[in-house]
Amino acid sequence: MPRKGPAPKRPLVLDPVYGSPLVTQLINKVLVDGKKSTAERIVYGALEGARAKSGGDPVAALKKAMENVKPSLEVRSRRVGGATYQVPVEVKPGRSTALALRWLVGYSKARREKTMTERLQNEILDASNGLGAAVKRREDTHKMAESNKAFAHYRW
């Protein structure tokens, strides 16, 4: 453990088009091999496509999708004696946002549309409507926490 405490959070540089920290985080999550301009093109294309399909504000659609994907509970492994228990714990806000972005981008990559822009756009729209693989992942996570509720007294 460091003696000076945890490292301070660095401020996010907001994206130039929407000025939203959430869009900036999404761009950074899509980023591969340091190609930021490519990641920006993918994300902005997906958001513009979402605007065209839904007819609303794309950042609002992204926020709605994030609310539908963010987990509130997860399970953590805890070793007690010789047994390992899956202990349900609450998820901190920063981690829930990070998990939601990771799931959105990860399940976008697994989709079958032709370009990453289309995949991300459709996953965002599906998630904002309560559908899609990322929302299913959140439901599975909550179900796992619910089924292991008996071990909640082991949480730390």
UniProtKB/Swiss-Prot annotation:
One of its GO terms (molecular function) is rRNA binding. Transmembrane segments: none annotated. It holds the Pfam family Ribosomal_S7. The keyword Ribonucleoprotein applies. InterPro entries: Ribosomal_uS7 (IPR000235), Ribosomal_uS7_bac/org-type (IPR005717), Ribosomal_uS7_CS (IPR020606), Ribosomal_uS7_dom (IPR023798), Ribosomal_uS7_dom_sf (IPR036823). Keywords: Ribonucleoprotein, Ribosomal protein, RNA-binding, rRNA-binding, tRNA-binding. GO terms for biological process: translation. One of its GO terms (cellular component) is small ribosomal subunit. Disulfide bonds: none annotated. One of the primary rRNA binding proteins, it binds directly to 16S rRNA where it nucleates assembly of the head domain of the 30S subunit. Is located at the subunit interface close to the decoding center, probably blocks exit of the E-site tRNA. Part of the 30S ribosomal subunit. Contacts proteins S9 and S11. Belongs to the universal ribosomal protein uS7 family. This is Small ribosomal subunit protein uS7. It comes from Arthrobacter sp. (strain FB24). The gene is rpsG.
